[in-house]
Amino acid sequence: METTNGTETWYESLHAVLKALNATLHSNLLCRPGPGLGPDNQTEERRASLPGRDDNSYMYILFVMFLFAVTVGSLILGYTRSRKVDKRSDPYHVYIKNRVSMI
């Protein structure tokens, strides 16, 4: 009976992802020119009329910027709220201030 290692499936899936990424990066699809090699007006018109691969890239950039802003905003709010809690539970405010007011 053969025992399976839990990292083998993880390693295989990681290898498959890296292999696909490598194939995508080294493929000629990204650098391949259009059907015409020369400066043909029909080629330019076809290229302009076809939907591009990066048409919604600005939406992706805005989405990432929004997520970054939400993350930074939550960190700032969390920090300022924790400072307010620390000020209220400060020993000066709890013990010394009350005793000075009694004198």
Curated annotation (Swiss-Prot):
Glycan-linked positions: 5, 22, 41
Effect on the protein upon substituting residue 99 to H: In BRGDA6; uncertain significance; also in a patient suffering from drug-induced torsades de pointes; uncertain significance
Tissues in which the UniProt entry reports expression: Expressed in hippocampal neurons (at protein level). Widely expressed with highest levels in kidney and moderate levels in small intestine.
Record bears the keyword Cytoplasm: yes
Membrane-related topology note: Single-pass type I membrane protein
Basic and acidic residues: bias regions: 43-53
Effect of residue 90 to N: Decreases current 4-fold in KCNH2/KCNE3 channel
InterPro entries recorded: K_chnl_KCNE, K_chnl_volt-dep_bsu_KCNE3
UniProt-annotated stretches for the region Interaction with KCNQ1: 68-79
Transmembrane region(s): 57-77
Pfam families named in the record: ISK_Channel (PF02060)
GO cellular component: basolateral part of cell; cytoplasm; dendrite; membrane raft; neuronal cell body membrane; perikaryon; plasma membrane; vesicle
GO BP, sorted A to Z: intracellular chloride ion homeostasis; membrane repolarization during action potential; membrane repolarization during ventricular cardiac muscle cell action potential; negative regulation of delayed rectifier potassium channel activity; negative regulation of membrane repolarization during ventricular cardiac muscle cell action potential; negative regulation of potassium ion export across plasma membrane; potassium ion export across plasma membrane; regulation of heart rate by cardiac conduction
Keyword tags: Brugada syndrome, Cell membrane, Cell projection, Cytoplasm, Disease variant, Glycoprotein, Ion transport, Membrane, Potassium, Potassium transport, Transmembrane, Transmembrane helix, Transport
Cytoplasmic side: 78-103
Locations listed in the record: Cell membrane; Cytoplasm; Perikaryon; Cell projection, Dendrite
GO MF annotation list: potassium channel regulator activity; transmembrane transporter binding; voltage-gated potassium channel activity
Subunit structure: Interacts with KCNB1. Interacts with KCNC2. Associates with KCNC4/Kv3.4. Interacts with KCNQ1; associates with a KCNQ1:KCNE3 stoichiometry of 4:4; produces a current with nearly instantaneous activation with a linear current-voltage relationship and alters membrane raft localization; affects KCNQ1 structure and gating properties.
Protein's name in the database: Potassium voltage-gated channel subfamily E member 3
Protein source organism: Homo sapiens (Human)
Gene expressing this chain: KCNE3
